[in-house]
Amino acid sequence: KYSEQTINDPVKTVLESPVVKEQTFIIKGKNYIAEVSNVGGGSIVSYALTKHLKKSESSLNLIDGYNSNNLVVSFVNQSGEIISLDKSWSLVSGGSANLSETNPEVSFLFTTEHLGRQVTKELFFYFDSYEIDISTSLRSLKDVSLDEKYTLSWVGGLPEHEGTQDAMFMEGLISQVGNIESFRVGAAGFFGSSSSSNIDAEEKRYVGQADFAGYRTKYFGLFFIPQKSDLVEITKYPTPLRAGVDIGITQDINLEKNKLYLGPLDYSSVENLGVGLEEKILGWQWLSSVSWLVYSIMISLYGFIPNYGVVVVLFAILIKLVTYPLMAKQLRSSKKM
């Protein structure tokens, strides 16, 4: 299903020259505030979560200086050069929006040119979802492409908000034919540090269709759900402050659809993707039924008591009541002995 290799010297990349002034647009959803730039044809330059926060936090941003150059489109030309279309994009339609139940979505259509031919990319944001739909059209470049394919990339991974705890969970993930494979990024030891000095540069290539592909830290993740991929490349490397992880999705130039999930590893949100990613959130397969039962009970209790601290205490009491008859029987048996 995949071949593994160590990173060699990068392939020569040809970049489009910047001629369009940068513009940014703000989208306010139910649980996030996103800022999108026309650079890169809709790169997300800020994505602040307003839910799943610590008491000391007013928001938590999943974008920093290492991953703001994201959602870049590229293709290989007839000379074998990688053409990265990361500049010179203009907004065709769309604008800043306050989303709501009555105004649940907004779209941004960007356009650029290569060799005088139009390329478009459209992003769709939703009020009550961390999903972003992406439609990319390079059909006009089909005859100048070497293999009639294009790549949509996320560069830089995610910030690490939990310090050394993140290192235990950092991994690239890909699902092919229902089988989820892990590409470890963080330090392996229980007390391992997420220092960039512990991360070796490495790339893995997964050939064939992927159900999803992405990267996670302890509590957050980014995942592509491609229309039909031909190749997925996951690359890890050190940066001065944290791990860098690039995700590249390559698919046929006629297939324009991709979905991006960017947000917390919340079970219900991840389950809505419909690609089986929630199985990874639940952990080992033999524990999944137990995990689901515990999750369902706690969510039900939270519906009546909107305080997870109280819910945990009540859940502990409930477990005590359920197991008390067995414990009492064991206690009587031990007294008889």
Where are the language model's segments positioned?
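Short, Gly/Pro- and small/polar-rich lid/capping loops
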Residues: 2-25
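Soluble non-transmembrane domains of integral membrane proteins
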Residues: 19-280
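Cytosolic-side membrane-insertion boundary helix
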Residues: 269-311
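Alpha-helical membrane-inserting segments
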Residues: 298-301, 318, 322
